[in-house]
Structures are given as structure tokens and as C-alpha cells.
């Protein structure tokens, strides 16, 4: 039986693996919309910027008064899958007893899922946090 945190992490990962962020063309618009919606009630300051309307980067920050900062970075673009090399649909996360399989699940959407969970729950997990924490979700790494 999965605990509550593991279930939420897998739900996030399942949702973001479904989003096509293949480079080329490298569109991250749908992913950015997901991040904004997921973090909507997090009380973090969320900024988006990009080179164009399709390649959008997100920064979510708690903006404390501290001079110390920590950045959690995830790139969210993936390579285009070679479908003949996949036994399953790369856009549908497959979960077995030990592993999760899906396009970008290891590089780097798995990290993005953890960062999203941490960002959303930052105040609850670390109520006395004094440092600046920034979560960046960037495109065009590939």
C-alpha cells in the first residue's frame, strides 16, 4: 500500500509525463499551465517567462528576507521518443512494484514531480524556514 506522499508524487508524475514537452519543438506551455494550477494555493510567488509563447519557464519562490537562497531546478523538455523502442505508451506512466516507466520519468520529470510536491507543501513541511527557496522549471535543455 502506498502512503499518501508516494501516491501524490506518482499522481504528479503521471500528470506531467502525459504532457508532451519533446524537443523539438520544445513547447512547455501546457506544462507551465499545469505548474501554475498545481501551485495556485501554495502562497509562493510564481513568475513565468520565455523566449516565445511556447517555451515558457517558471520560477516559484517563497521570497523570505534572508540573504541565503536555495534553488531546486528541473528541466522539463524531453527527447522525442522512438516509439518502436517502447513496449508501452511513453506518455502513460506505467507503475510496477519497483519502477515507474514513462517519457522523462527519470530525466527530469521525476525530479520536477518532487520539486512540485515540495513547493506546494513548503510551509507545512518547514514552518520556520528562513531561507529563500526557488523552484525553477525550465525548458530547452535538450
Question: What are these model-derived regions, one by one?
Answer:
Residues 2-105, 122-130:
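Acidic/His- and Gly-rich active-site-bordering loop/insert found
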Residues 108-142:
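Acidic/histidine-rich catalytic neighborhood of metal-dependent amide-processing enzymes
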Amino acid at each position: 500500500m502506498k502512503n499518501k506522499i508516494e501516491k501524490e508524487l506518482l499522481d504528479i508524475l503521471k500528470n506531467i509525463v502525459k504532457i508532451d514537452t519533446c524537443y523539438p519543438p520544445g513547447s512547455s506551455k501546457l506544462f507551465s499551465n499545469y505548474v501554475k494550477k498545481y501551485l495556485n494555493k501554495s502562497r509562493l510567488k510564481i513568475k513565468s517567462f520565455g523566449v516565445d509563447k511556447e517555451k515558457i519557464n517558471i520560477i516559484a519562490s517563497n521570497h523570505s528576507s534572508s540573504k541565503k537562497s536555495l534553488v531546486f531546478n528541473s528541466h522539463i523538455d524531453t527527447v522525442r521518443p522512438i516509439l518502436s523502442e517502447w513496449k508501452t505508451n511513453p506518455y502513460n506512466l506505467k507503475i510496477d512494484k519497483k519502477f515507474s516507466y514513462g517519457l522523462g520519468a527519470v530525466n527530469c520529470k521525476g525530479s520536477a514531480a518532487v520539486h512540485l510536491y515540495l513547493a506546494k507543501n513548503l510551509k507545512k513541511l518547514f514552518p520556520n524556514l528562513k531561507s529563500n527557496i526557488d523552484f525553477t522549471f525550465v525548458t530547452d535543455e535538450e
